[in-house]
Amino acid sequence: MKVNPSVKPICDKCRLIRRHGRVMVICSDPRHKQRQG
């Protein structure tokens, strides 16, 4: 899980979602998981 000030989809399987007011990227590749913070 990377924590970045700006989260962007890396590949075409990345999905941008909002969870508890946080913007997150979920993907089938675990290295692409990101959270804004």
UniProtKB/Swiss-Prot annotation:
Cellular compartments per GO CC: cytoplasm; ribonucleoprotein complex; ribosome
Cystines in this chain: none
Pfam families per record: Ribosomal_L36 (PF00444)
InterPro entries (UniProt xref): Ribosomal_bL36, Ribosomal_bL36_sp
Keywords: Ribonucleoprotein, Ribosomal protein
Family as reported in the entry's similarity comment: Belongs to the bacterial ribosomal protein bL36 family.
Protein name from the UniProt record: Large ribosomal subunit protein bL36
PANTHER family reported for this sequence: 50S RIBOSOMAL PROTEIN L36, CHLOROPLASTIC, LARGE RIBOSOMAL SUBUNIT PROTEIN BL36C
GO terms of molecular function: structural constituent of ribosome
Listed GO biological process terms: translation
The keyword Metal-binding is assigned to this record: no
